[in-house]
Amino acid sequence: MNPLGYVPALVLDDGTLLTEGAAIVQYIADQVPSKKLAPPNGTIERARLQAWLNFCSSEIHKGGFSPLFYKGIPEEGKNVFRARLVARFIYLNEHLKSNEYLMGHDYSVADAHLFVVSNWASWVKFDLSPYTNVVSYRGRIGTRAAVRSAMEAEGLIPWPSAQPQ
């Protein structure tokens, strides 16, 4: 489906293919603006949302967790990415000390995106427990009815804890 050979990909009713998680979640949020999962286009808040989505995609996903899944990368190389993740989670932990969600007090698609990506920590044995604000944040998101419903539908319940397995 995705010509690049990876997920996610969304095929719209008219056959249009949309790829990349950040683009997909913004598109979905824009279809139901009354849910307020994304600030209105053209606002500074929307730019901040895009900044968080880019941070999740580039710093946590592609530049952090993804290389840890590749068997061909030696441990010394993987340690570079683990160190990057430590720095990024320290940053997130500090931000979440005074913010309920990435955008402050309002849940957004950036939170959904980070929740999914941060679930990979247990699969690559990256311990999130030192980042207590991140762990609390993940708990808040993981107990949301829509999140639990989606995770049950995908067979992901129980969702990974903060501890590596």
Segments predicted by a language model, with ranges:
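GST-like domain detector, emphasizing the conserved glutathione-binding G-site
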Residues: M1-F89, N93
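Residue-level recognition of oxygen-bearing side chains
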Residues: A23, N133, A146
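The C-terminal cap of the DNA-recognition helix in HTH/winged-HTH DNA-binding domains
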Residues: P33, K97-S98, T143
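GST superfamily/GST-like fold recognition
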Residues: G64-F65, L102-P130, V135-T143, M151
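Hydrophobic alpha-helical bundle segments that form small-molecule/ligand-binding pockets
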Residues: F89-M103
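Terminal-tail/helix-coil boundary detector
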Residues: A150-Q165
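Charged/polar positions within long, soluble alpha-helices
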Residues: F65, E94-K97, A146, E152
